[in-house]
From Swiss-Prot:
Belongs to the small Tim family. This is Mitochondrial import inner membrane translocase subunit TIM10. GO terms for biological process: protein insertion into mitochondrial inner membrane. Pfam families: zf-Tim10_DDP. It comes from Eremothecium gossypii (strain ATCC 10895 / CBS 109.51 / FGSC 9923 / NRRL Y-1056).
Length: 89
């Protein structure tokens, strides 16, 4: 609790700020995913109301790669954070 090596207690305001920051990151990632995969996979001349098979397959692969990359980057960042200590340079 008080300096016993545990996690510091966050105030309600800090928790709200952290949740808002996380929501902003998730929203930004989603918007980038939609923009990038749409630009890559969907022809700008809309001829049909539905996706064709090639567009659908491309979107599936694009989204899967985007999430896979996001997971790998997160794992690497977490590992870097664990390897870093104040006395280590």
């Amino acid at each position: 609790m008080f300096g016993l090596g545990g996690q510091p207690q966050l105030s309600s305001q800090q928790k709200i700020a952290a949740a808002e920051a996380e929501l902003d990151l998730v929203t930004d990632m989603f918007n980038k995913l939609v923009s990038n995969c749409h630009r890559k996979c969907i022809d700008m001349n809309y001829n049909e109301g539905d996706l064709n098979k090639n567009e659908s397959n491309c979107l599936d692969r694009c989204v899967a790669k985007y999430f896979e990359t996001n997971v790998k980057v997160g794992e690497n960042m977490q590992q870097l954070g664990q390897n870093f200590s104040p006395g280590k340079f």
